[in-house]
Amino acid sequence: MIFIDACFRKETPYTPIWMMRQAGRYLSEYQESRKKAGSFLELCKNSDLATEVTLQPVEILGVDAAILFSDILVVPLEMGLNLEFIPKKGPHFLETITDLKSVESLKVGAYKQLNYVYDTISQTRQKLSREKALIGFCGSPWTLATYMIEGEGSKSYAKSKKMLYSEPEVLKALLEKLSLELIEYLSLQIQAGVNAVMIFDSWASALEKEAYLKFSWDYLKKISKELKKRYAHIPVILFPKGIGAYLDSIDGEFDVFGVDWGTPLTAAKKILGGKYVLQGNLEPTRLYDKNALEEGVETILKVMGNQGHIFNLGHGMLPDLPRENAKYLVQLVHAKTRR
């Protein structure tokens, strides 16, 4: 698989490409599948439809990897927190984590309840071409904790940060509990058939450097170390969004570092490129315009050259991006990097 070879810095015939949120609302096929499911959460839980949605971007765009269609919040959901998705607002937990007692009340072994995810993986792997990789994923302990403490997405993360500074032992207990679940969750994804795993630390930039390293990065390192110990042949990709200023403190046992669009690739390559393969980092809104897209691709390829790079966006696809431009991006990257 070209994608897996690239994760391990092996020679590839061209630079592989996939896109975060490549299965999404910009595709009419996705919207049809979602309509059939009835709701976003039901789409995640319906393995037949989730498989359909996972495969759509591979078939339509020609990307080199599929990423499992699911949501990072299925883990806290199965740990016992009631989750709903409010239209135009996003995810909302009906209960929140406020103290040690509420951390202790979370169910252990939630990963055993996620058979709908593992079924999606095995179905997708059966239908996916052998040359194409399937990526599994989860959210980072810190990012999941913020949703569980705030009850929803936040601009200030005030409740989470208040806990971090005034009751660090409560937050640590939650992060520890989540880490153990996530290790087993990703392990079962691997056993079900994924070829690589990715951990999304979407709210990494909410923390100052020392707090980030202690309350997020340390847990990411713990998870990736255990996964590499168990499955050395499976690439681990970490994507901590918005920590470009902390790159000099990044270390650990993983294979690929996801670079967001706000972090200059030149800096990421200089600091991390010798040790990790870099993934990224086209600004997603460049896909609105073909000239802007071409310019962005040119800049990235000039910096990264032929090896140690997986092409991706620096954040997820937006719902109204033109699908023909997404397809053009894949063709352009393949054509420009073919060797």
UniProtKB/Swiss-Prot annotation:
Recorded name of the encoding gene: hemE
Keyword Amino-acid biosynthesis attributed: no
InterPro entries reported in the protein's UniProt record: UROD/MetE-like_sf, Uroporphyrinogen_deCO2ase_HemE, Uroporphyrinogen_deCOase
Taxonomic source organism: Helicobacter pylori (strain ATCC 700392 / 26695)
Subunit structure: Homodimer.
One Pfam family recorded for the sequence: URO-D
EC number: 4.1.1.37
Reactions mediated catalytically: uroporphyrinogen III + 4 H(+) = coproporphyrinogen III + 4 CO2
Residues binding substrate, per UniProt: 21-25, 40, 71, 147, 202, 315
Primary localization class, coarse: cytoplasm
Entry's localization field: Cytoplasm
Protein role: Catalyzes the decarboxylation of four acetate groups of uroporphyrinogen-III to yield coproporphyrinogen-III.
Protein name (record): Uroporphyrinogen decarboxylase
